[in-house]
Amino acid sequence: MPPTMLASVPTRPRSHPFRRRRGAAAAAPPLLPDQIAAAAAAAAKRPAESSTSASSCFHSEVISATSTTCPTSLAAAQRPEKRPRYQDVDEEQPAASECSEIIGGARPRAAEVEVSESSCLASVLESYLACPEQLANDAETTAYSSAREDLTLSETEEEEEEEEVRSGPCICTDCSFSPLHESSSSSDDDNAVPSPTFSLFLALAEQFVPFTHPKTPTATDVALQAGEGKRFEDLDNEVSYERFRRRERRGVVARDYIEVYSSMLGSYGRAVVEQRVVMVNWIMEHSQAMKLQPETVFMGIGLMDRFLTRGYVKGSRNLQLLGIACTTLATRIEENQPYNCILQKAFKVGINTYSRSEVVAMEWLVQEVLDFQCFVTTTHHFLWFYLKAANADDRVEDLAKYLALLSLLDHKHLSFWPSTVAAAVVALACLATNNESSCHLVMETHMRTKNDDLPECLMSLEWLTNYAS
């Protein structure tokens, strides 16, 4: 029995009061009535104790005192008072953690479990992976996750969703934000002060202008033909390739928004075109300095282009902030530890410096505008498939990846699907290295739709051959 546990209360006296033990001394002389009364008064003055040893001693005193004088009350005195099975609610109970330290194996109470879980969660949130900025006034949170939806879609659901892909221009006149943004104006607590980052997010959201131009050149959206084109020999590669081809058309419109901004009145449209080139160069230089993966570069530029396709934020400073936020957001998504941690407190583009709070606020706006659908296919995802179809060597592979990066500088590739741009880049790399047979294999693998625009894409990217030497 552990030393901290109380001894059980005996259900009967240890020995009969009238039975003398063998070899024991003679019984003590009986007490007088005055002695009995004095013993009872002394016992009444003692404080009540929960210990079993004290009660048993008092019990033995009363039994020994009344054994010779009060035989009628002997039976009642012999019965010890039953101890309640459950302790009183108001009685203080020892913590489970204290008992477990002494006796071990004790199960903690629910309250202690909640405290321990909250403390563990707090320690996790203080890690490098978590952003120190927290959203204020978040009355509601949505359980929708586009990334989880993409990962759990079955092939049947993908085929059904393929029919609902938008092939026309993205008219964002009814652009609405999530309940997170709406809760800022309808919060129950009027005295709550939002954090500085959340205040910046609200200011950027007010400056956002949805893209409303109805006529923009878009890529044709035609369903993939089952019997068209050359297939991969490996079934897994074929299934993955077809899935990427369907996914690139899900909720994304391929169009050149630069022509629309160029036709806008005023100088802001021209500023968008100029700042895009500046930020694409900055993203490439930043990725090279931070040793980021090529996937991060393509995703960062892709997020910026998709944002500008749906709208823009007024001010050239905000355009640079948009490029930084898209890069940091892509870094969080694509990079492994510890490179996915954004530890910089300031970002500098030219002579302009941007704080971490500004970048995080723009990250929130980018996710709001894109409906939190940041996991999209890029040109880099298709390079592997076409290089494998062409049986390319290291020289062709390095040249194709280099030309793919250069294609990001030109806005003309935005009018084509990422798979078309990747096929055109690999085909140009094959032609530059005198591998015409490999070029035909790439074109046969890609052209699985009627009226495919791969020839037009090759002509628009023909300037890349000047950098192939």
UniProtKB/Swiss-Prot annotation:
Transmembrane segments: none annotated. Keywords: Cell cycle, Cell division, Cyclin, Meiosis. Residues 13-23 have a biased composition (Basic residues). The keyword Nucleotide-binding does not apply. Residues 155-164 have a biased composition (Acidic residues). InterPro entries: Cyclin, Cyclin-like_dom, Cyclin-like_sf, Cyclin_A/B-like, Cyclin_C-dom, Cyclin_N, Cyclins_cyclin-box. Residues 1-31, 69-98, 146-168 are annotated as: Disordered. Residues 79-88 have a biased composition (Basic and acidic residues). The keyword Chloroplast does not apply. Transcribed preferentially in early stages of meiocyte development and during meiosis in young flowers, especially in anthers. SUPFAM superfamilies: Cyclin-like. Disruption phenotype: Normal vegetative growth, pollen production and viability are severely reduced, male meiosis I is defective. GO terms for molecular function: cyclin-dependent protein serine/threonine kinase regulator activity. It holds the Pfam family Cyclin_C. One of its GO terms (biological process) is cell division. One of its GO terms (cellular component) is cytoplasm. Meiosis-specific cyclin. Required for normal homolog synapsis and recombination in early to mid-prophase 1. Belongs to the cyclin family. This is Cyclin-SDS-like. The gene is SDS.
